[in-house]
Amino acid sequence: MALPPARTLYAPGRGELFLRDTGGDGPPIMLLHGWMASADLNWWGAYGALVDAGYRVLAIDHRGHGRGLRSILPFRLSDCAADAAAALDLLGAAPATVVGYSMGGAIAQLLAHDHPETVSGIVLSGTAHDWQDPRERWFWRSMGLLWAATAVAPHWMWRIALGRLGFRDPDMASWLVSELLRASARDIAEAGRELGRFDSRSWIGSLGIPAAVVVTTRDSIVSPSKQRRLAAAMGATVFEASIDHLEVVKPGYVPALREAVESVAARPLEASPWASAGAP
């Protein structure tokens, strides 16, 4: 599996930011990953297809996730959005099309709202404009238990979870576990609680930029109906992928994602040199 080149940027007042950057002169896309994941875990199945379509692909690891920034401050979604904005500015890649999955969708919404000069279009998937219904609020309140589990027995917990998701190849499972173990248990738990507090309903319809939503139609974590309500609130074009929430690496997801990106992004130019140097 080939991954795009890694970059570490120093953002004054923030710290070191880790991201993937395929380079090239294509329209920039910033990929924002989901909760507990890293950029590579969420997006490795999509990197090659987006580069082949002519885009410059950027994918940041959020605070407390993967190789992302570690801070003594509590995890805040708004800080993740500010980190992404800083990376785009430092790279001269703003404004970019921003693509957010799950928690990354909440961060993408905040990025477009709080840093509008950095965003030219937005694609959301497997996400919502709030998680306020009783079942969701109960789930997010349980994040202290998750923190304890990931801190006490992380290898055991992740290997069981991956086995249930059908990852049987030992090399792939080892890589996935190694990526998951990079995360900070404290930040993971706090990120979950932050999601429980997130609510963009009062302003999501006022972003005024091209928007698309890829609805994960078999999603057991973020209901498809809630994803459609988000799309309606934004006036976004709807695309569909017949997957559950944790199946973004399945073949059916990437074509829908690429179509959604093409519906809002600037016209692609020549592909990045990375495309011919090792894209999957």
Identify the meaning behind each predicted range.
Residues 15-67:
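Conserved HGGG/HGGXW glycine-rich cap/lid loop of the alpha/beta-hydrolase fold
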Residues 249-263:
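Post-His helix in hydrolase/transferase enzymes
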Residues 211-244, 250-252:
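Conserved loop-alpha-helix segment in the C-terminal half of the alpha/beta-hydrolase fold
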Residues 44, 52, 58-97:
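Active-site loop/oxyanion-hole signature of alpha/beta-hydrolase fold enzymes
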Residues 133-134, 151-205:
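Conserved alpha/beta-hydrolase catalytic His-Asp/Glu region
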Residues 109, 113, 121-150:
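Flexible "cap/lid" loop of the alpha/beta hydrolase fold
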Residues 100, 104, 108:
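Gly/Ala-rich beta-loop-alpha elbow adjacent to hydrolase catalytic centers
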Residues 98-100, 125:
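Short beta-strand immediately N-terminal to the catalytic nucleophile in serine-hydrolase-like folds
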